[in-house]
């Protein structure tokens, strides 16, 4: 049964998922309880706030908002404070000038009257909220809903809040509508600050002019932007967020980011934000921690509110105002900046009370129910997906979860959490394990195939061979595992094509292609990895003398025609463009007809294409018999051994392969093909070329 059929016929109690996965039958009551708990929150929000649509527009009520007459209304939730004042350069930081009043829900408010019809707080001027807490201490904080903060490292690493309200003529005006949602999602994961070969922090403007055309040329149709939400510590890779409504100022202004998103849309690229709602920076002076003098405003109090490994604060998803803050944060990034969706970071930490720390997941269904599940975290993620998909039907949401929770990518109506895709996190781990622990002739083709195809029925998966995680210092990219130090000496076409480089380039292409073809309903690549970027990522920090040497992407390597990186880059482009033509990512899962452990040959069919992989390190096979369902004449549409991709050209592009009407490996026909060592061929019926 398909997902849409299940939705149509499912009972209205959250147990519809059982029709798709009967193994969930023993957990019927738990599914009902989960569904009922979430519905209870939906009902409460409908009754008290007028529904998720109104509730998620908190940024129009909280923070600083300019009225049509020029007045500025500032509201802040800080129930523990006994006094509160808005201070800034506009009133010489005078704590008596703009006192705030508190309502019964702990929300403080002040109106700053306009001066001659214009806002009294100048654009880009510094502001803070000053509060007195019950002990009598006066504290200063950055407004929780602030839209811009800036950092002057020559003065202090602490961020300062500024009032962002540029004059009309300096406000970026969006010119392009959102592209339609891609049927096949091909994601280019990128970090603005490292997107330059120079040893510096690159800017939004530079990304717009340099990276967008590159991503479009490579054939990707989606960009996933990391480290956009403001984070004081650059080396955190954006995962220790201080200010949730502020776009990082180290790359430029909010208007620059709007231009980036708009220009991406003009190229038909959708833009996803890497959103971090799994935890927050523990910073006090420029974060949410201890905001009103308590440790339990936005977060759980005590140890429950601290993540042991990340050294950060954990949100209390079961609090009405925290839900308002987080749901409004998602809505804000969609509305203000025009993002097309989100990749949710650290979902495993949100789903479980143990946060995945010291816990392995066996796949036993009992692990997904019971006391170890954070039902409030599940509820928040479900409400987030409900809100986003109801308001923005083309919105894309991706979950980073290692646990394999059932129904994560099914709609709430079936008892699911509502994500569109989950990341196939076991796949890159498999490749690292193979390269670290196995000789090439020990590769288990059956396990390779199983890992790539082991995904939940009806739930979409984004496959990837490696992401930013594998590029970070302390780990190695696939190309570094494959070629190691020879990357520095033998990637020139003027040098010997050594066995190590030949093997490395061949397997780099094979790994990417088999992942793309077999691994999911979407594909992701981290910038630079498409061409085998040398070295790792290491941001400036005390441990490396604040060096930018490894905090950059040497994208210029592909432009040097004397280097072999161009071959890998061109192969990656051909792979994306071939997918665009044949659409295997949105086709049904592949039929695998052969997993030959002796020959190290893998054969499967998907989207009308025949995929043939020879992973054997030394053996090539002549007239190798391969089963195929559809009869006819086949031609090569992609060949990893093509000289255009640095290959040895052992199969001619013009070769025709004719089927024979005899069954083979469970298929109605077979054809015979020459498959050289460490190569892959993708064949298509001649009439589809």
Swiss-Prot record:
Coiled coil: none annotated. InterPro entries: A-amylase/branching_C, Branching_enzy, Glyco_hydro_13_cat_dom, Glyco_hydro_13_N, Glyco_hydro_b, Glycoside_hydrolase_SF, Ig-like_fold, Ig_E-set. It is found in: Cytoplasm. Keywords: Cytoplasm, Glycogen biosynthesis, Glycosyltransferase, Transferase. GO terms for biological process: glycogen biosynthetic process. Disulfide bonds: none annotated. The active site is at 345 (nucleophile), 400 (proton donor). It comes from the Eukaryota. Its EC number is 2.4.1.18. It holds the Pfam family Alpha-amylase. Gene3D superfamilies: Glycosidases, Golgi alpha-mannosidase II, Immunoglobulins. It catalyses: Transfers a segment of a (1->4)-alpha-D-glucan chain to a primary hydroxy group in a similar glucan chain. Glycogen-branching enzyme participates in the glycogen biosynthetic process along with glycogenin and glycogen synthase. Generates alpha-1,6-glucosidic branches from alpha-1,4-linked glucose chains, to increase solubility of the glycogen polymer. Belongs to the glycosyl hydrolase 13 family. GlgB subfamily. This is 1,4-alpha-glucan-branching enzyme. It comes from Aspergillus oryzae (strain ATCC 42149 / RIB 40) (Yellow koji mold). The gene is gbeA.
């Amino acid at each position: 049964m398909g997902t849409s059929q299940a939705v149509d016929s499912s009972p209205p109690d959250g147990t519809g998922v059982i029709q798709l996965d009967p193994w969930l039958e023993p957990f019927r009551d738990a599914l009902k309880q989960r569904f009922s708990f979430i519905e209870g929150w939906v009902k409460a929000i409908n009754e008290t706030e007028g529904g998720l649509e109104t509730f998620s527009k908190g940024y129009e009520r909280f923070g600083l908002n300019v009225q049509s007459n020029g007045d500025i209304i500032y509201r802040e939730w800080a129930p523990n404070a006994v006094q509160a004042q808005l201070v800034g350069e506009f009133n010489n930081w005078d704590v008596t000038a703009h006192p705030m009043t508190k309502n019964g829900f702990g929300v403080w408010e002040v109106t700053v009257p306009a001066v001659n019809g214009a806002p009294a707080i100048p654009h880009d001027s510094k502001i803070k909220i000053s509060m007195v807490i019950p002990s009598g201490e006066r504290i200063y904080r950055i407004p929780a809903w602030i839209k811009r903060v800036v950092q002057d490292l020559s003065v202090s690493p602490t961020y300062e809040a500024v009032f962002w309200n540029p004059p009309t003529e300096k406000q970026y005006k969006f010119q392009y509508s959102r592209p339609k949602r891609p049927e096949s999602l091909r994601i280019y994961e990128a970090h603005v600050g490292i997107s330059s070969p120079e040893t510096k922090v690159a800017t939004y403007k530079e990304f717009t002019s340099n990276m967008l055309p590159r991503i479009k040329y490579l054939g990707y149709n989606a960009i996933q932007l990391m480290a956009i939400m403001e984070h004081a510590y650059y080396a955190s890779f954006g995962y220790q967020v201080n200010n949730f409504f502020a776009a990082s100022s180290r790359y430029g202004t909010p208007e620059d980011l709007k231009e980036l998103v708009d220009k991406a849309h003009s190229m038909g690229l959708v833009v996803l934000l890497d959103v971090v709602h799994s935890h927050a920076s523990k910073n006090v002076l420029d974060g949410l921690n201890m905001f009103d003098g308590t440790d339990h405003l936005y977060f759980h109090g005590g140890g429950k509110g601290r993540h042991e490994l990340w050294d950060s604060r954990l949100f209390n998803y079961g609090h009405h105002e925290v839900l308002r803050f987080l749901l409004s944060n998602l809505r804000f990034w969609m509305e203000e900046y025009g993002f097309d969706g989100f990749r949710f970071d650290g979902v495993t930490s949100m789903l479980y009370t143990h946060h995945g720390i010291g816990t392995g997941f066996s796949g036993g269904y009992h692990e997904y129910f019971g006391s170890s599940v954070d039902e409030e975290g599940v509820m928040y993620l479900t409400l987030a997906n409900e809100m986003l998909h109801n308001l923005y039907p083309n919105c894309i949401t991706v979950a980073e979860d290692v646990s394999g929770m059932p129904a994560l990518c099914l709609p709430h109506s079936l008892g699911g959490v509502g994500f569109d895709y989950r990341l196939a996190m076991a796949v890159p781990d498999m490749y690292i394990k193979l390269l670290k622990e196995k000789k090439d002739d020990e590769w288990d083709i059956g396990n390779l195939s199983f890992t790539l195809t082991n995904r939940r029925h009806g739930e979409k998966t984004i496959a990837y061979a490696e992401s930013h995680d594998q590029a970070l210092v302390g780990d190695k990219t696939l190309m570094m595992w494959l070629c190691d130090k020879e990357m520095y000496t033998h990637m020139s076409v003027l040098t010997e094509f050594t066995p190590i480089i030949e093997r490395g380039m061949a397997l780099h292409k094979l790994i990417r292609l088999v992942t793309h073809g077999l691994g999911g309903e979407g594909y992701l690549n981290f910038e630079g990895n498409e061409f085998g970027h040398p070295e790792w990522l290491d941001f400036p920090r005390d441990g490396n003398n604040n060096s930018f040497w490894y905090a950059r992407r040497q994208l210029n390597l592909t432009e040097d025609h004397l280097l072999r990186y161009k071959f890998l880059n061109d192969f990656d482009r051909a792979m994306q463009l071939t997918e665009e033509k044949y659409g295997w990512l949105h086709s049904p899962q592949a039929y695998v007809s052969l997993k030959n452990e002796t020959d190290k040959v893998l054969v499967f069919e998907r989207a009308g294409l025949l995929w043939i992989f020879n992973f054997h390190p030394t053996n090539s096979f002549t007239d190798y018999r391969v089963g195929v369902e559809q009869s006819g004449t086949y031609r090569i549409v992609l060949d990893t051994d093509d000289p255009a991709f640095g290959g040895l050209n052992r199969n001619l592009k013009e070769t025709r392969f004719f089927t024979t009407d005899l069954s083979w490996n469970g298929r109605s026909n077979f054809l015979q093909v020459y498959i050289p060592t460490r190569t892959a061929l993708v064949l298509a019926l001649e009439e589809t070329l």
